[in-house]
Amino acid sequence: MKGLALCLVLSMATTMAFAAGGAEAAPASPAKSWDFAKETPLADVRIRQALAYAIDMKTITETLFEGLASPARSMTNVGAWQSPKLTEYAYNPQKAKELLAAVQWPADYVLDVVTYYADQQTADFLTTVQDYLSKVGVQMKWRLLEGDLAAQLWVAPADMVNGPSVVKWDLAYAAVAASAESEFYVRYGSTAPNNSHTPKDEVMDKLLEGLNVVDVNTQIKAMHAVQERLNEKLYSIPLYHQIAFIYVGNLLDIKGTVHGNDQFSYEKNILNWEIKRADGTMYTNTGPKEFWEAPITNPGLYAYQEYLFDKLINADASLTPTTGMLAKSYTVSPDGLKFVFDLKTDVKWHDGKPFTAEDVKFTIEFMARTNSFAAVNYKSIVGAEDYVAKKADGISGIVIDGNKVTVTFAKVNPNASLVFSQWPMLPRHLLKDSDPMTTQTDQFWQKPIGTGPFKAGEFVRNNYAVLERFDGYYRKGTGNIQKIFMSASGDNDPNLMVNAEAGKIDYAWSKSTADAKAIGKLPNFTVTKAPIRYTRFFHINQFPHMPNVK
């Protein structure tokens, strides 16, 4: 905590030093009457550019994040997949003031900034941004969202051209943990079910279509074009790229498991892990808070999502799809349009019911009607668009023949294998009457049932939850873990250091640089840096909406 406080002081001091050179007040905005029911200043690209110019991300990453994050020019990190033609919106408060004056920014408007991160580093970051914006004449207040986040953040307007907005915020401090590069960008399409922020852009829609190719070089060129459009229009403000940290205590033997991106599911062989505790309990973080989050927006962010639910296909530490999981085997046609899954016949749900091909068909159809990256990909299946539009009773491109399920895509989807390895199967017999758009409120998610190696046990809201080894699992393993005790947290765990010192962490992960430094000093932990495809940014709500802060 002291380190974070010091970083914040340094950041604030740097801010004031920069501001001192041009200390004149921002030019007074000429009076303009804004009809917020029909327009928002945030729809003007100059306002979005001004906000970007006003924030010194170089200083913030060097101080607050202690050099363990890097300023972002796009959602994609530096490398072959990032376009070399992108404009860098480097810190320039005078430019920000000029742009705000040109658009007649309403000086009494207070930006309503929301986030779902409850850790101290987020509070420090947003307080620092608040200070930067005030230097150019922009007021801002931020607040923490709780409860059903998808309903508060990612509901698209009925009219993607004119709005109005469904969500109630100006800026959302959020992140994308992308399983594939395209996952960063599909949310800007006018048909994306989670596009709550960016009005229809026909040019962007066409560029996004260009990502649906298999050849890597062609896909990279298409990705560059999408990035350049987003960089020009600045529909969101990329802030910084982060790495993750994985912590393993000395009581746990993970038997050579290769660390990967713990924001997603990959083969950890947890059934072979051994814990030096007589009761076989392993302690970890990322447990449920108010409820067990449905694996829709985040299919593997929380520990329980990976251990409660299995997928059709397995993946290795690099998230490359490998062998079958719930599928005994699978094949892909040479043109990449047809997947055939030969399902295992000895799989049971945690309530003892058999897992069947009907569960596979149900899950894909269920997910196609959600606000998720999976839905965007499933809509490429033959007949999916008619099903989502309620013009058909099912997706015609999904065909069941005994224990075999054939899924036929209407067009090449380079992310299909990835989606099948990340989004789990769900029980038809328990969720068939649940509305996909509001499923998080279903009683099922108070104690979910999956096909994974562990089943849901005791749950104390905003405190902890317990997973118990499932005796009916189709694989056995050689390890001795009988229970997993999960402290309630997101991917930035405010109690991680406290729990580590108290002996209540054996395996955990987070993105907090402060935690990484502190836990790294403990003699009984190994800390591993894990490169991840992860970018924090500000989503900007460009649909008409009334001011939330009065």
Located regions from the model:
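Ligand-site clamp/hinge motif
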Residues: 26, 139, 442-445, 472-518, ...
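A bilobed periplasmic-binding-protein/Venus flytrap-type ligand-binding module shared by bacterial periplasmic
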Residues: 29-47, 63, 207, 242, ...
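A structural "hinge/loop" feature
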Residues: 35, 40, 247-265, 286-306, ...
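Structural transition elements
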Residues: 38, 43-45, 53, 70-102, ...
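Aromatic- and charge-enriched surface segment that lines or borders ligand/interaction sites
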Residues: 41-43, 328-374, 406, 499-502
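Detector for C-terminal structural segments
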Residues: 50-84, 121-131, 158-288, 303-304, ...
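N-terminal lobe/hinge region of extracytoplasmic solute-binding protein
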Residues: 284-332, 365, 449
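Surface-exposed binding/hinge segments that line
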Residues: 377-433
